[in-house]
């Protein structure tokens, strides 16, 4: 028991089961009693009556289960949960249980036993040792479970309860407000650079400073207002015999000029009539209209009159 690190003043719950020897159980209890001293306490409990004993929660610093040599009990999930409940936060559980090397319905493997301890709310699950079962424990196990395999071994594991109650809650201080970022420190400016970009009013009257007069940059020709002819490109409407044609992206005004000329030609060549209704058809024509009998036509459309009506009868 020296490897358990049980200290004076600790409260220990010793869980035993059949077919443990009463003499061996008494010796183990007395050994633990000498370790905890008068300020501590050692309580004995049968595994089959653990759930009915109603121990107070978080009472024991240690729970030692099935550590007797002839013990061969299987810890159910309810039993492990009850052991975790009665342990103080930060307390430890040390147990021994027969395991198998292969998957079986009656017995667990060492890995599944570790998972069962973790599911009970315990942490820091560690396998301490593994060894064979005693003949008495093996016989009792085969009788209770019917297991006839040859891969049995006895494993000792330890686990700890977290430093808080399992299922306890605590309010978290969370801040969802927007945090104002701290202004970043601006890099220091080089004094020489800052001086180069600073213009003093006194520098304007310095004789060594040469200021350029903007009016001196323009000559007399630059101040003249250009006429429209000078703005045209040399090849714009080139040639006296060729028809004038504006450029694709004309910006000198030739395109607008040619458009106005074409509109004037169309206006002059459009035929005129006294009544202005000849093109609508016979219903709108005069009795002496030369277009009588002809179909309606569009305004300005060229119409050729037949010369049959001009011959003498």
From Swiss-Prot:
- Residue ranges for motif Cx2C motif 2? 286-289
**Which intervals of the chain are annotated as region Linker?**
171-223
Pfam families with a match to the protein in the record: Anamorsin_N (PF20922), CIAPIN1 (PF05093)
- Renumbered to this chain, region (Fe-S binding site B) spans 275-289
Q: Where is this region: N-terminal SAM-like domain?
A: 6-170
Report the superkingdom from the record. Answer: Eukaryota
Give any single GO term for biological process.
hemopoiesis
Cofactor dependence: [2Fe-2S] cluster; [4Fe-4S] cluster
The residues listed in the UniProt record as binding [4Fe-4S] cluster, with positions renumbered to this chain, are 275, 278, 286, 289
User: What keywords appear on the UniProt entry?
Assistant: 2Fe-2S, 4Fe-4S, Apoptosis, Cytoplasm, Iron, Iron-sulfur, Metal-binding, Mitochondrion, Nucleus
Return the annotated region ranges for Disordered: 162-190
Q: Where is this region: Fe-S binding site A?
A: 236-252
Q: Molecular function (GO) terms listed?
A: 2 iron, 2 sulfur cluster binding; 4 iron, 4 sulfur cluster binding; electron transfer activity; metal ion binding
Binding residue positions for [2Fe-2S] cluster? 236, 247, 250, 252
Compartments where found: Cytoplasm; Nucleus; Mitochondrion intermembrane space
User: Where does the motif Cx2C motif 1 lie?
Assistant: 275-278
InterPro entries for this protein: Anamorsin, Anamorsin_N_metazoan, CIAPIN1, SAM-dependent_MTases_sf
Q: Which GO terms describe its cellular component?
A: mitochondrial intermembrane space; nucleus
- Extract the HAMAP family matched here: Anamorsin (MF_03115)
Annotated domain remarks: The twin Cx2C motifs are involved in the recognition by the mitochondrial CHCHD4/MIA40-GFER/ERV1 disulfide relay system. The formation of 2 disulfide bonds in the Cx2C motifs through dithiol/disulfide exchange reactions effectively traps the protein in the mitochondrial intermembrane space.
The subunit field of the Swiss-Prot or TrEMBL record says: Monomer. Interacts with ndor1. Interacts with chchd4.
Q: What is this protein for, i.e. what is its function?
A: Component of the cytosolic iron-sulfur (Fe-S) protein assembly (CIA) machinery required for the maturation of extramitochondrial Fe-S proteins. Part of an electron transfer chain functioning in an early step of cytosolic Fe-S biogenesis, facilitating the de novo assembly of a [4Fe-4S] cluster on the scaffold complex NUBP1-NUBP2. Electrons are transferred to CIAPIN1 from NADPH via the FAD- and FMN-containing protein NDOR1.
Spell out the family assignment given in the record's similarity comment.
Belongs to the anamorsin family.
What is the protein name given in its UniProt record? Anamorsin-B
